[in-house]
Amino acid sequence: MGVWGRRGGVVAGVLVAGVAVTGCGSVDVAGAPVEREVFAFQGRELVVDSVGSDLVVGAGDVEDVRVERQVDGWGVGGSGPEARWELVDGRLRIRVECDGIASGCGAVHRVLVPRDVAVSVTGEDGDVAVEGFATAVKVRSDNGDVRVSKVSGALDIGSDNGDVRAEDGLGSGEVVVRSDNGDVRLSFGVVPRRVDVAGDNGDLTVTLPRAEYEVSGSSGNGDRNIDVPVREGSGRKVSLRSDNGDVTVRTAN
């Protein structure tokens, strides 16, 4: 069933953070109570803005926005973890904060969105996973990995510090990825029209179905490996640029 269960329910235990903190305490998000909230929503695009939590965003057969969270933590000389969520004017705002002289927090939020809604996701200090959208998806991540699966709408990803993975039969016709620090791996299940990937520090790998592509690949400090049929003027354009890392374009078979 993947990240999301039948009837639009959210499957617990997916992308759960569990952080051990030596000497003072431990964080057990998987064992934390599950809290649930349903937010009324009408619109064509949902903005998800998360700080301090891992995040799973998926599309389902629902008419509203459904959120589950698990939060755990500890604090010395403070209040421990404080979690807040609200949906106002099309923006779902998620915050998890630790307060204290010494503290440790961990959290995961799972967000279920109507299938016909596009999403724009911003994650800070946490991993981001997005699954199951046929609509446009935009992801911005600051300090966390990004994982995308079963997405067929236009895809736009920006990552400041973390790996980017879209390897489960990516169906998007147009994909743009910008990465400051981390590897990027894209694996397509359909022939895309446009792929544009640029990275400052990390390997870039794109796996494509067999077809002819117009390919541009360059690296300031790394190997360049182009192993797909290449034809100038093809309507299918692939561009990879890395300042410091290998650049690879290859066929799936």
Go through the PLM ranges and name each one.
Residues 2-77, 99-106, 110, 223-234:
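Short acidic/polar N-terminal linker immediately downstream of export determinants
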Residues 47, 56, 82-84, 110, ...:
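Short, surface-exposed charged micro-motifs
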Residues 41, 50-52, 87-89, 123, ...:
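A generic beta-sheet turn/junction motif
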Residues 35-39, 80-153, 164-166, 185-187, ...:
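Right-handed parallel beta-helix
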Residues 22-26, 47-53, 75-79, 113-115, ...:
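Short low-complexity stretches enriched in small and charged residues
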Residues 59, 68, 78-79, 103-108, ...:
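A short, polar/proline- and glycine-enriched secondary-structure boundary/capping micro-motif
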Residues 44, 65, 117, 213-215:
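Short beta-strand/loop motifs in extracellular/secreted proteins, especially
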Residues 166-253:
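Short, surface-exposed interaction patches in beta-rich subdomains
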